[in-house]
Regions:
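Active-site helix of classical SDR
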Residues: 120, 157, 165
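Conserved glycine-rich cofactor-binding loop
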Residues: 16-17
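Substrate-binding pocket helix/loop in short-chain dehydrogenase/reductase
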Residues: 96-97, 104-106, 192, 204
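Residue(s) in the substrate-gating loop at a strand-loop-helix junction
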Residues: 140
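Short C-terminal tail/terminal secondary-structure segment
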Residues: 1-4, 145, 224, 235-248
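Short, small/polar-rich loop/turn modules that mediate ligand/substrate recognition or access, typified
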Residues: 173, 178, 234-235
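Alpha-helical segment proximal to the catalytic Tyr-Lys
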Residues: 125, 166, 170-171, 232
């Protein structure tokens, strides 16, 4: 694979921390110009400042269609176009079936599912016109298994992301636009290392055949692989990133 990309623009949602921030770094290192979007972007702007004007940060709430349109319009004004869209923004609702309120259910769907649809809807027209595009959706191990804990709203929303991935892939393949998804499990984010107890981490590690959590850099480079121009014959794929925890 050719290492350096020239003159391509990538949009990353949920870019201010964790998997999104790691993805921004990997794309910048590969040569992309990157539009990083999130509810607030101070951290990504600070940590990626060395990349200068190849990075631009925009406030965008993926559950708000007006903000999606405004941010994408600003990105296109600054960079000219959007070639790659990484739908990473997400919300994890810690509630079982009986604990899930209508408000929590709808919030989860607005961010995790509606956000993927409406961001993609906004950017895919330009990709189609130019005859090239890469859409990478972040689903979840839980979408395929129900998850290790009872999180029905989250699992259902991410299952919807996988279905959207299949639908987009079929609709836009003839126009040079691919759409694929990642289904990660136990990526070593701050949430995992700080909010999951040491005892629970030990229990989880026993379930993962490779015996460790996924590094952020490993996650980001899987995104980079699916976003690359040389990955044009891969579409409608869900790439499992789970250390052998589950096989199709």
């Amino acid at each position: 694979m050719k290492p350096q990309i020239k003159d391509q623009v990538a949009l990353v949602t949920g870019a201010n921390s964790g998997m999104g921030l790691a993805t921004v770094r990997a794309l910048l290192e590969a040569g992309y110009r990157v539009a990083a979007t999130d509810l607030q972007t101070a951290q990504v702007a600070h940590k990626m400042a060395a990349y200068g004007d190849r990075l631009a940060c925009f406030i965008m709430d993926v559950s708000d269609r007006a903000q999606i349109d405004a941010a994408c319009t600003a990105i296109e004004a600054q960079f000219g176009r959007i070639d790659v869209c990484v739908n990473n923004a997400g919300f994890l609702s810690y509630a079982n079936c009986e604990e899930t309120t209508p408000e929590l259910w709808h919030k989860t769907m607005r961010i995790n599912l509606d956000g993927v649809f409406f961001v993609t809807q906004r950017v895919v027209g330009g990709m189609k016109t130019r005859g090239f595009g890469r859409i990478v959706n972040i689903a979840s191990f839980g979408a395929k298994t129900g998850g290790m804990s009872p999180l029905p709203a989250y699992a259902a929303s991410k299952g919807g992301v996988i279905s959207l991935t299949f639908s987009f892939a079929r609709e836009y393949a003839a126009f040079g636009v691919t759409c694929n998804a990642l289904a990660p499990a136990f990526v070593k984010t701050q949430m995992v290392t700080e909010q999951v107890s040491a005892e629970r981490q030990v229990e989880l590690l026993k379930l993962i055949p490779v015996g460790r959590f996924c590094e952020l850099e490993e996650f980001a480079h899987c995104v980079l692989f699916l976003a690359h121009p040389l990955s044009g014959f891969i579409t409608g794929e869900v790439l499992d990133l789970n250390g052998g925890l589950q096989f199709d």
